[in-house]
């Protein structure tokens, strides 16, 4: 298809007759790459889901604790947390978290409502069935 791209192995490129634009794009020998399927529809609840969100916390003492506390109180496990500098505001950060549960679960909705009290924005990135353990 035109206007499509993929990051894959050279074997996949051969099987699917794809043109290789760049090889060995990793910058770290033992890196792991996350792959996303981007679409316009939400996945329905599978019963074994993860959700990814991004948020910028308001700048206050203890704010990250306040943001994560609702997850802990509701026994929602985080599987990943990363921070990146927020380009629009010096010394502020955007946090990316993955957690177990689906966006349509009322318990998750309640946690995100509490989180919203401490954030300048929250962006839902997706809910998806858990693939496998690495």
Regions found by a protein language model. Name each.
Residues 1-134:
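Domain-level signature for soluble enzymes in the chorismate/prephenate branch of the shikimate pathway
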